Amino acid sequence: MVTVKFKYKGEEKEVDISKIKKVWRVGKMISFTYDDNGKTGRGAVSEKDAPKELLQMLEKSGKK
């Protein structure tokens, strides 16, 4: 199980990569949306801290 750890509004969060819906790049950050128990959650992680699976999802989406 691969998870992405990130901070959102000052709170440490962790999400399973299988719950991530959409991934895109904003400068040197990787932003994403994920399923948060029926709601849409948002997160971002720096490119250097992103797990390789998240970077692969970004490549597949074609949004470089």
UniProtKB/Swiss-Prot annotation:
Protein origin, superkingdom: Archaea
Locations listed in the record: Cytoplasm
Keyword DNA-binding (UniProt): yes
Chief location bin: cytoplasm
GO annotations of cellular component type: cytoplasm
Transmembrane is among the record's keywords: no
Temperature profile: Hyperthermostable.
pH-activity relationship: Highly stable from pH 0 to pH 12.
Keywords: Cytoplasm, DNA-binding, Methylation
Residue list for modification N6-methyllysine: 5, 7
GO molecular function annotations of the record: DNA binding; RNA endonuclease activity
InterPro entries hit by this protein: Chromo-like_dom_sf, DNA-bd_7a-e_arc
NCBIfam families: Sul7d
Similarity remark: Belongs to the 7 kDa DNA-binding/endoribonuclease P2 family.
Quaternary structure and partners: Monomer.
Primary role: Can constrain negative DNA supercoils. May be involved in maintaining the integrity of the genome at high temperature.
Name of this protein: DNA-binding protein 7
Species this protein is from: Sulfurisphaera tokodaii (strain DSM 16993 / JCM 10545 / NBRC 100140 / 7)
